[in-house]
Amino acid sequence: MAPGKGGYKQINKALNICAFEDYLDGQQATLPPLQDVEQISPRVIRVLGQNPGKFTLQGTNTYIVGTGSERLIIDTGQGIPDWADLISTTLLDGNFSLSHVLLTHWHGDHTGGVPDLLRLYPDLISGIYKHTPSKIQQPIEDGQVFKVEGATVRAVHAPGHSSDHMCFILEEEQAMFTGDNVLGHGTSAVEHLSTWMAALQQMKSHNCRKGYPAHGIVINDLQGRITGQLAQKFRRERQVLKALEQVKSQERAMAGGRGKGSVTVKQLVSTMHGDSLDGGIRELALEPFTEEILRKLAEDGKVAFEIRTGIKKWFVVGTALD
């Protein structure tokens, strides 16, 4: 499949991806190449999903885990026939079989290869596991343990990118399969920002050193990557709060100390970034991102909104920057 053509679009529905085409094209061009099949640790073989794209990066990483004659696999790619061929060849060459299929979440670039696995290995029909399973799948509970020779894998429910998102800890390596919550390059799109940030805090609490992401290279300092991702989001929150405080102060200075300083998202973006922004970037990217941050801050009790003449306007609550 040609780079840039494949990939399951997993992004906030409010966000129009056209605003990011140039950035995504540039990012994809600089990605390091990954081997189709690579033994990345004594217990882990990475098999690329053969679906490179702007959202899937080099392709979906699927992981065969264990050292014995029966192993488990995490994620199944997008349903590309070449991936199924790689899996079949890898199992044949290694003289081992699969006993469990663990799915990180429902997105098609992670579950699309399940029919191919069942075609190749019908006995797996009772061994497919996912949080919030379909009829042919088994449930995964938070803390559930899966064991094969050489590997103990513990499930961690970590929603945010999606409500059913699971990560998996490989106990023997103090490593975590991070799914789409933390990627090998860049940052992930999320369904719910507050939930995702809480999930990252939870992931960090397990003190795993290494991360095996669903897209991109191995993360050698998982703790540092998570810390950096959270710090970036907190910086953006503070930028939004600072801008709201600025608007509030200006309004009160002009109104004798009265006023909430409520503004629309469009007005807030202008306060933060000026009025000379490209219209597409503003409307298709910055405004949806800013509103997502505002919703998270509202859940935290730091901002609120009011409806004036049918228009939603946001304002800071108290001294939110303290």
Swiss-Prot record:
PANTHER family: ATROCHRYSONE CARBOXYL ACP THIOESTERASE, ENDORIBONUCLEASE LACTB2. Zn(2+) 2 binds at residues 109-110. Atrochrysone carboxyl ACP thioesterase; part of the gene cluster that mediates the biosynthesis of the dimeric xanthones cryptosporioptides. The pathway begins with the synthesis of atrochrysone thioester by the polyketide synthase dmx-nrPKS. The atrochrysone carboxyl ACP thioesterase dmxR1 then breaks the thioester bond and releases the atrochrysone carboxylic acid from dmx-nrPKS. Atrochrysone carboxylic acid is decarboxylated by the decarboxylase dmxR15, and oxidized by the anthrone oxygenase dmxR16 to yield emodin. Emodin is then reduced to emodin hydroquinone by the oxidoreductase dmxR7. Gene3D superfamilies: Ribonuclease Z/Hydroxyacylglutathione hydrolase-like (3.60.15.10), Winged helix-like DNA-binding domain superfamily/Winged helix DNA-binding domain (1.10.10.10). Keywords: Hydrolase, Metal-binding, Zinc. SMART domains: Lactamase_B. It comes from Cryptosporiopsis sp. (strain 8999). Zn(2+) 1 binds at residues 105, 107. Its EC number is 3.1.2.-. Its cofactor is Zn(2+). InterPro entries: LACTB2-like_MBL-fold (IPR047921), Metallo-B-lactamas (IPR001279), RibonucZ/Hydroxyglut_hydro (IPR036866), Sec-metab_biosynth-thioest (IPR050662), WH-like_DNA-bd_sf (IPR036388). This is Atrochrysone carboxyl ACP thioesterase dmxR1. Signal peptide: none annotated. Pathway: Secondary metabolite biosynthesis. The active site is at 109 (proton donor/acceptor). The keyword Kinase does not apply. The keyword Transcription does not apply. One of its GO terms (biological process) is secondary metabolite biosynthetic process. It is an enzyme of class 3 (hydrolase). Binds 2 Zn(2+) ions per subunit. SUPFAM superfamilies: Metallo-hydrolase/oxidoreductase (SSF56281). Belongs to the metallo-beta-lactamase superfamily. One of its GO terms (molecular function) is metal ion binding.
